[in-house]
Amino acid sequence: MRHPFKVVVVTGVPGVGKTTVIKELQGLAEKEGVKLHIVNFGSFMLDTAVKLGLVEDRDKIRTLPLRRQLELQREAAKRIVAEASKALGGDGVLIIDTHALVKTVAGYWPGLPKHVLDELKPDMIAVVEASPEEVAARQARDTTRYRVDIGGVEGVKRLMENARAASIASAIQYASTVAIVENREGEAAKAAEELLRLIKNL
């Protein structure tokens, strides 16, 4: 039911700041002697997609045909576990930066369906949240990413509600805990402290 190492899936809608929280978490964990191996699920999908000549950047992955995304998703999960097994052995925590729900050209798509969960076997699914207004503002400021299709404050609000529900639905399959971590503006370090506290209690 579980890997020798602990698995924590950190989710959040685009622009919520989960990657920033994870970076803060890494620094805190190092200070406290907690061994982490951090991966970005999208990077693993992108690597395979680029090699196959399907896309040039990660924001284009969600525009691919759904069945193609499914293949990339399955391959990413397998590669992540293989890498973590080598890096962590039987000790430490695998942190996976990903989305519980992705807005695609064919509708909302689960980031943590059964075939992915069967590979990852998460101990915890952490949902990083902020107010929809803050998230929409962060999206607007980030000119390095294409997020126009998310849909402004109302679009963010709907996506956040559905993503939280998707996280809980995914957690049921593996009896994973679900943790809601608030990432208020300028308080990523505080969010990381809370996340580390929860991880240490697993």
UniProtKB/Swiss-Prot annotation:
ATP binds at G12, V13, P14, G15, V16, G17, K18, T19, T20. Pfam families: AAA_17. It comes from the Archaea. One of its GO terms (cellular component) is cytoplasm. Keywords: ATP-binding, Cytoplasm, Kinase, Nucleotide-binding, Transferase. Its main location: cytoplasm. Its EC number is 2.7.4.3. It catalyses: AMP + ATP = 2 ADP. One of its GO terms (molecular function) is adenylate kinase activity. InterPro entries: AAA+_ATPase, Adenylate_kinase_AdkA, P-loop_NTPase. It is found in: Cytoplasm. It is an enzyme of class 2 (transferase). Belongs to the archaeal adenylate kinase family. HAMAP family: Adenylate_kinase_AdkA. This is Adenylate kinase. It comes from Aeropyrum pernix (strain ATCC 700893 / DSM 11879 / JCM 9820 / NBRC 100138 / K1). The lineage of its organism: Archaea, Thermoproteota, Thermoprotei, Desulfurococcales, Desulfurococcaceae.
